[in-house]
Amino acid sequence: MRLSQSLFVTLREDPADAEIPSHKLLLRAGYIRRIGRGIYAYLPLMWRVLQKVSQIVREEMNATGAQETLLPQLQPAEIWQESGRWDTYTQAEGIMFSLRDRLDGELGLGPTHEEVITTIAKDMIRSYRQLPQHLYQIQTKFRDEIRPRFGLMRGREFIMKDGYSFHASEECLKKTYADMDQAYRNMLRRCGLQFRAVEADSGAIGGSGSQEFMILADAGEDEILYTEDEKYAANTEKAVSLPVEAIASPFNSFEKRETPNTATIESLCKFLNCSPTCVVKNVLYQVVYNNGKTVLALISIRGDQDVNEVKLQNELTKLAPNYDAKTVISLTVPDADAQQKWAAKSLPLGYISPALADDCIAKNKAVSGEFLRLVDPTAATLENFVTGADETNYHVLGANWGTEFKLPPLQVDVRLAKAGDRAVHDPTQILQTARGIEAGHIFQLGTKYSEAMGATFTDENGKEHPLVMGCYGVGVSRLAQAAVEQSYDENGIIWPVAIAPYHAVVVVPNVKSEEQMAAAEKLYADLNAAGVETILDDRNERAGVKFKDAELIGIPFRVVTGKSLKDGKVEVVRRKEGDRQDLDLDAVVATLKNWVEAAGQ
């Protein structure tokens, strides 16, 4: 490629709407252009990067025996209603674009393809002899993000590899899951990225277990908790830990005490001169299920701990059948306006007890008349604790479960693990924190979709069983931007060689010099012929502009046909290392070819 003939425009200033370094650099370097909110065009340089990432992904998938396919982006609502996810994706999470066709049929633009692939399996797989099967695609996906941000990191349109496997048994699924774990590690290593595999929440996709592959970067949206012995790592949404030991309560007898202006844990503990580990705090949540039913959930947890709302939503979803519902579409801490819709009286927020009376809820068919009471293990084990008295400016001290308060029967872990907690597998290990960008996610789905949609097979005895499923996703466009977030400097992008749009750029400082142009043309031809993908900067621009652009776009190796030509040499610069050296003209091709090959090992 010759830059003089290319659509190539760089910016000297950071775009105003770009927030993180990788987003700024991809815009400035002419890789992408914003078309609308969360919608970007992939320009020629970016498309080459995406093709290289896709090819690495494709090679690793094919090596496991997976078969590439292409599934429809338009998906009928009926198959999503059959799986039970239509309300979740169009109402609760609200991330699916939905539309109606001219026949008034309801459709969705695919954010994922479990329903489509299960429909295919239902129609085509009959016998255990056809199993296992593993299909994947690399395709554009659509998600109506509430707040698209960070360029390709969280867009409304993006490129993804999604794969789906079908099995006769959990054991067979686990083998494919392990194969995918290794394949994903291979993909990320080949792309030149530093990453960490972590336990993760399965979210709306569901299943019994999942693992995320996080690219380590300060701008990552996800927090990772891990131990230095490398035996535990998890997304905070999923992480478990041992909290610090509770300090013994100084209150040995039960009493109600006036505690003015102590609606927060901090102010209460300061007033009582006690540790927050002695306090049971009670957090009220308003839960709305997909059938419109509102339930008020009262969560009791130790005073120094916070509620993990992902864990809580998962538990509330399990309880949905108790309310003739399937899923949670809203989980909020109700403000004063929200309370007016269901509260029979003003609630003493900040002073609530675990026994807040059900008559606080006004009679309303759309609202459950009883509080759903859950207790976290950190609170369930406390003795002589402090908690609210259900009266503003009053708390009770020295309270105990079984005497002053009935212990809720639902004891579930809804605690947010955090850095500084002790590890479950080894309490001497302290959880550390890092930021990460989710580039891949693998799931053991089990029979969630096959049971819901009637996708079955017959075993060797002729007995019918639901197909056991797994699914495996890689964000191709996100991975490409994450590589930039992990590798850049003050001058621009530093692409890993494996996914750089080109391996080398030949820069002609003075295009009017016949000697410089002749040497550059020969190097350009010889390098490409040797398999070193090379662009030629033959623009009629100042040398300084060309050098700045070469650094900005992040091509790994730069060859300059400058002043040293008189000695039969050219300057070669390695972008990552930043070193410069003069090489004989006849040594350039072999040297760069060796560097490219070494980077791929």
Swiss-Prot record:
Catalytic activity: tRNA(Pro) + L-proline + ATP = L-prolyl-tRNA(Pro) + AMP + diphosphate
Biological role stated in the UniProt entry: Catalyzes the attachment of proline to tRNA(Pro) in a two-step reaction: proline is first activated by ATP to form Pro-AMP and then transferred to the acceptor end of tRNA(Pro). As ProRS can inadvertently accommodate and process non-cognate amino acids such as alanine and cysteine, to avoid such errors it has two additional distinct editing activities against alanine. One activity is designated as 'pretransfer' editing and involves the tRNA(Pro)-independent hydrolysis of activated Ala-AMP.
The enzyme's E.C. designation: 6.1.1.15
GO molecular function: aminoacyl-tRNA deacylase activity; ATP binding; proline-tRNA ligase activity
Name assigned to this protein: Proline--tRNA ligase
Lineage: Bacteria, Bacillati, Cyanobacteriota, Cyanophyceae, Oscillatoriophycideae
Native organism: Picosynechococcus sp. (strain ATCC 27264 / PCC 7002 / PR-6) (Agmenellum quadruplicatum)
Keywords assigned: Aminoacyl-tRNA synthetase, ATP-binding, Cytoplasm, Ligase, Nucleotide-binding, Protein biosynthesis
Comment text on domains: Consists of three domains: the N-terminal catalytic domain, the editing domain and the C-terminal anticodon-binding domain.
GO biological process, one term: prolyl-tRNA aminoacylation
InterPro entries to which the protein is assigned, alphabetical: aa-tRNA-synt_IIb (IPR002314), aa-tRNA-synth_II (IPR006195), aa-tRNA-synth_II/BPL/LPL (IPR045864), Anticodon-bd (IPR004154), Anticodon-bd_dom_sf (IPR036621), Pro-tRNA-ligase_IIa (IPR002316), Pro-tRNA-synth_IIa_bac-type (IPR004500), Pro-tRNA-Synthase_IIa_type1 (IPR023717)
CDD domains: ProRS-INS, ProRS_anticodon_short, ProRS_core_prok
PANTHER family registered for this protein in UniProt: MITOCHONDRIAL RIBOSOME PROTEIN L39/PROLYL-TRNA LIGASE FAMILY MEMBER, PROLINE--TRNA LIGASE
Gene name as annotated: proS
Subcellular location: Cytoplasm
